Amino acid sequence: MNIIETITKSDKNISDNTSNIQRISLDKLRTNPIPNNKNEIWRLTNKSKFNRFLDFKFTNDFYDPDIPGYSNIQNICRIIIGENKRIKLKRENWEIKELEEKEIQNFLQQKIIKSDTTQNWSNLLNHFLTDNKNIIGLNISGKEIPPLEIICNSKNNFLNAKTLIINIEEDTIVSISQINIGDKNSALSISSYFNIAQHSVLNHGIISYGKNKANIINTLNVWQHKNSEYNLGSLQFEYDFGRLEININQVEGNAKTNIKGMQITNNNEQISTYANIAFNGPNGFLDQLNKSLANDKSHSVFEGLIIVPQ
């Protein structure tokens, strides 16, 4: 497996351009190169499909995605991760600006340095693979913000990795769509982080669709503060191997979370969703619904865990 060999090989073969985040992630992965399938969140994973995901040759090169639909949609801000375009949009009522590289590195280091290697294996793999040009960090504030569309894509015969970090300031309302596009016979690793401040609302849609023999591991990490609202709708289909890991933390309680998910499988595909919702304070609200359509010999998996304070 190409990726596992890269993890376990000598430090002498690691590039001098490797970032501190990549080195920390690599050190942690070396203690647990492959997740233990006895762990609940990995127990039902199809081993042969997972191994195939890890066997792709990795690249950080950018490829123009084949985006379906209209190419010039009015009043939508489209961002393609890896395109290397500067982002700074400001109007009277709102602002979207990039986080500084140091802010991004400090944030990621804080999140991964004490992370459990099994529960956070997918994030660690992503951060080991992703270089700086495939990481986007945004700070969003205000109201009447036009919808954001964020594109991640993989390239035929390669594994690509992308990271997204978004901080949503207080009293902000925003709608964000993530479109994950898997080219045929490819693999895509995505880690997304959203910090939602007090009295803010994030309407979040995720559409992940692939072509023949496409693969994806997609992790979503959300922190909600008091009186915030997070509304997630997700759709996954046409992936030979697809995995969505949702981790939501109501940091102080008193927040509202709505999750609606749909996954569609055919032939011998496997698509899985794992949702972990933590309430670290009183008066939290959760409404969660996940639906699956599984045809032929395919497998559709959903597991949910709710953690409440003692």
Placement of each model-derived feature along the sequence:
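Glycine-rich and polybasic anion-binding loops at the starts of cofactor/ligand-binding domains
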Residues: 1-290, 301
